[in-house]
């Protein structure tokens, strides 16, 4: 196990479990962890979640915050009975609340599994395919740029210098005839 450390937005330090003997990359892993005792260290995979504020980064503020008043409105002069309005409000609110709970109970865990797999694949591809491809491309481009630079300095520079010298001696005299 590694001793990788991560800090979240609240300043908590997370780490994967630390072995007593360390590992081949960080043999003094346990000693390093004890030095950081002033910060509370959490396991990255068992991070405590907030059951009250479930959208701490406000991802869905503009999208799914739909209340009864956002969907159904009666303008002045066109009002239903007060009892109907109250019953409609209650029906809408309770139906939305419980149907969301039903859908999340049925599909929440399977969707979390699917999205977990998707983002794991995405992370894997980024780490093991995209970044190495970009790095190799940059290495190849650097090699090609050196060859291109030699070509330009060998062939193009002398040619354009010669053309520049040819045209540098051209003089234009304008005279007005009377």
Swiss-Prot record:
The modification N6-acetyllysine is found at residue 5. The modification N-acetylserine is found at residue 2. It comes from the Eukaryota. Residues 105-125 dip into the membrane without crossing it. There is a cross-link at residues 5, 26, 30, 39, 47, 57 (Glycyl lysine isopeptide (Lys-Gly) (interchain with G-Cter in ubiquitin)). Keywords: Acetylation, Cell membrane, Golgi apparatus, Isopeptide bond, Lipoprotein, Membrane, Palmitate, Phosphoprotein, Ubl conjugation. Residues 149-160 are annotated as: Interacts with SPRY1, SPRY2, and SPRY4. The keyword Phosphoprotein applies. It is a peripheral membrane protein. Residues 2-94 are annotated as: Required for homooligomerization. Residues 131-142, 167-178 are annotated as: Interacts with SPRY1, SPRY2, SPRY3 and SPRY4. GO terms for molecular function: ATPase binding; identical protein binding; inward rectifier potassium channel inhibitor activity; molecular adaptor activity; nitric-oxide synthase binding; oxysterol binding; peptidase activator activity; protein heterodimerization activity. The modification Phosphotyrosine is found at residues 6, 14, 25. Residues 2-104, 126-178 are cytoplasmic. Its main location: Golgi. Belongs to the caveolin family. This is Caveolin-1. It comes from Canis lupus familiaris.
């Amino acid at each position: 196990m590694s001793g990788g450390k991560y800090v979240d937005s609240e300043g908590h330090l997370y780490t994967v479990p630390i072995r007593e003997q360390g590992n081949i990359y960080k043999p003094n892993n346990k000693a390093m962890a004890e030095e950081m005792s002033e910060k509370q260290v959490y396991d990255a995979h068992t991070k405590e979640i907030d059951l009250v504020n479930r959208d701490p980064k406000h991802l869905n503020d503009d999208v799914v915050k739909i209340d009864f008043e956002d969907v159904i409105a009666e303008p002045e002069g066109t009002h239903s009975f007060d009892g109907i309005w109250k019953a409609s409000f209650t029906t809408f609110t309770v139906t939305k609340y419980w149907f969301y709970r039903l859908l999340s109970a049925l599909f929440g865990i399977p969707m979390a599994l699917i999205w977990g797999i998707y983002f794991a694949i995405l992370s894997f591809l980024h780490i093991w395919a995209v970044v190495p491809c970009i790095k190799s491309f940059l290495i190849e481009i650097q090699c090609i740029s050196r060859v291109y630079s030699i070509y330009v300095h060998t062939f193009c520079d002398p040619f354009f210098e010669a053309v520049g010298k040819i045209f540098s001696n051209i003089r234009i005299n304008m005279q007005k005839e009377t």
